[in-house]
């Protein structure tokens, strides 16, 4: 059901195509995908995309991605069942928020135990505060009332964590510096935070300078091979740098098409 493999990703792509073409078939298909996504919501308010895992927080496989997709659907279909699913999804995800770390628990299993049980807090587009921040930025622009209040509160709680995670050992979009720093820039487009804007611009300049001096562009090889792909590899880094030159290019991490 998630953004990567399921209904949430389909909804965002289909509504994006509708906005580009005005072809109602895309919107009708998005509505059908949304009905299935709402029906699949678990009692805890999350979604179980993998039968071997519990409900997760986060953008790629967790509630942040599902709720963002439903908020995009709400733009075109003001249905109470969609609104209720969004509220429940936010409540579930925020039940995993830990104030001390200004981040959300990563409930995936690694070597037989949950990552969160060892106090490891992922900070990436895929899992953790950066992707959740991007989801909330989009939600506060699509929704109104109580949902916006929740989204803005989450944004304020997590922006510092996201910016502090922009100088790690990997530069990819999915779980690296270019992805996290680009999410901070999306925040700066919406919120008049001049201090964060200046810090973000400096971080991006430093990252691009380091990338230009590294033949691997800061990407660790997988099994001895260079990753050329978009989210995990060179293509995504190149696209993110292109967005510095052309501010009109869409944010692919939010599945924007324009």
Where are these regions (language model features)?
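Alpha-solenoid repeat junctions
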Residues: 11, 15-19, 67, 74, ...
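A beta-strand-loop signature enriched in Asp, Gly, Thr, and Trp
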Residues: 105-119, 125-128, 133-183
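Long, well-ordered core segments of solenoidal/helical folds
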Residues: 29-46, 85-103, 146-168, 198-216, ...
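Acidic, glycine-rich loop-and-beta core segments that form the ion-binding/anion-interacting portion
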Residues: 65-124, 129
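Solenoidal tandem-repeat scaffolds enriched in leucines and small polar residues
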Residues: 1-84, 95
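Terminal, non-catalytic domain-edge segments
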Residues: 72, 76, 116, 138-146, ...
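Carbohydrate-binding/catalytic loop surfaces
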Residues: 8-12, 45-65, 102-124, 175-189, ...
